[in-house]
Amino acid sequence: MTHRIKPVSYEALYAAHHGEVLRLCRLLLANHHDAEEIAQEVFLKVYQQFQNMNQTELMMWRPWLIRVSVNACRDRRRSGWWKLWRGANEEYQEANYPNSSRTPEEMVLSREAQGRIWRAFEKLSARQREVFVLRHVDEWSTEEVAEMLGITTGSVKRYLFRAARHLRRILGDR
């Protein structure tokens, strides 16, 4: 029996994965505007490579897309202007959309808790954040994370252990 692979369009890939790439970039860069810019750069690279990809590569492109996204975020963090900008703008401002089902007190407490978690998360090393997000937020296996980042599974486990230990220490074991 022959299995036909349904042709995949660039538009379909973009629609299916743009949100995921944007979320990953926001978590790694802690800045919505930078994340949007990097996500656009990532999909520009995807568009440039799309014509050269065969159907098998297109069907298994998600790990490649994540790897390209992580590398683009790393490049942004390494750039001199970004370091200057981040130093001058320490507070990460997340848009807070009102939720009418919660009281103002609950909303304030929720924002405070989110702020505490975010500040603790930002204190992780860049590699710890990458590994933590890919493993626990995006739910990739340890082996997949290792392959995407070009490190061993032992290194992934070590980064996860250190990240969890750091977060427990900062946030308390609640």
Question: Can you say where each PLM-predicted feature lies in the sequence?
Answer:
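DNA-recognition helix of helix-turn-helix
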Residues: 70, 74, 143, 147-173
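A short, charge-rich alpha-helical start-of-domain segment used by transcription regulators
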Residues: 1-23, 33-39, 47, 119
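Sigma70-family region 2
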Residues: 2-4, 43-60, 79-81
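Structural recognition of an alpha-helix C-terminal capping motif at a helix-to-coil junction
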Residues: 37-44, 48, 59-71
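A short pre-motif secondary-structure segment
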Residues: 131-135
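Internal acidic/polar
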Residues: 83-110, 141
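Arg/Lys-rich amphipathic alpha helix in sigma70-family domain 2
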Residues: 52, 67-88, 110
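C-terminal flanking helix
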Residues: 18, 22, 43, 125, ...
